[in-house]
């Protein structure tokens, strides 16, 4: 698997799994009916943000990640990242590989920390992955997410230093 900067030509390969993940309504705070145009603007924003893809040897896009400042101005030294793995590639280490790549990129860009603002507490695979990579839960929004099957569940704020 290769991880590289996403190009506009990758979008048609990202959109189908991104659309399905968001429409499921279980892990992202985006509108479940997000349009392709809205999603492209959110997922592939201009610099200083960057988007990467994990690509199989056959050219299939297995997953994608976005790295950006968590806040602007005096808060721009803390990074934020988002990750989506194609369901067909789940359990194959794609998320971990994307995370390692993004953490390295954030360090290289001079970020001092990384923060995830809204990790759905019932997304246990993600929570376990982030904990294994040194992230800690530093905050909790009680019932901050409407899960389609589980009702109101907590959102976690997760953080780790990069220096």
Language model segments and positions:
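A short beta-loop-alpha structural element at the N-terminal edge
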Residues: 2-14
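Acetyl-CoA-dependent GNAT
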Residues: 8, 31-88, 99-100, 105, ...
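Helix-loop element at the rim of GNAT/NAT acetyltransferase active sites that forms part
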Residues: 11, 16-33
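Active-site acidic-Proline motif in GNAT/NAT acetyltransferases
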Residues: 85-88, 92, 120-122
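Conserved acetyl-CoA-binding loop-helix of GNAT-fold acetyltransferases
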Residues: 91-108, 127-132
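Conserved GNAT acetyl-CoA-binding A-motif
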Residues: 106-119
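Conserved beta-strand-loop-alpha-helix junction that forms the acyl-donor binding cleft
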Residues: 116-126, 144-146
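Conserved acetyl-CoA-binding loop of GNAT-fold acetyltransferases
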Residues: 131-140
């Amino acid at each position: 698997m290769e991880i590289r900067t996403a190009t506009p030509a990758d979008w048609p390969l990202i959109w189908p799994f991104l659309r399905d993940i968001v429409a499921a309504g279980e892990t992202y705070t985006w509108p479940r009916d997000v349009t392709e145009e809205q999603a492209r603007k959110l997922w592939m924003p201009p610099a200083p943000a960057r988007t990467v893809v994990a690509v199989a040897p056959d050219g299939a896009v297995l997953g994608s990640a976005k790295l950006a400042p968590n806040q602007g101005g005096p808060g721009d030294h803390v990074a934020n990242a988002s990750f989506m793995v194609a369901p067909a590639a789940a359990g194959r280490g794609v998320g971990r590989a994307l995370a390692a790549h993004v953490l390295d990129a954030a360090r290289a860009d001079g970020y001092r920390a990384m923060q995830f603002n809204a990790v759905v507490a019932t997304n246990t695979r993600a929570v376990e992955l982030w904990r294994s990579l040194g992230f800690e839960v530093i905050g909790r929004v009680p019932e901050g997410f409407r899960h389609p099957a589980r009702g109101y569940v907590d959102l976690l704020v997760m953080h780790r230093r990069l220096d």
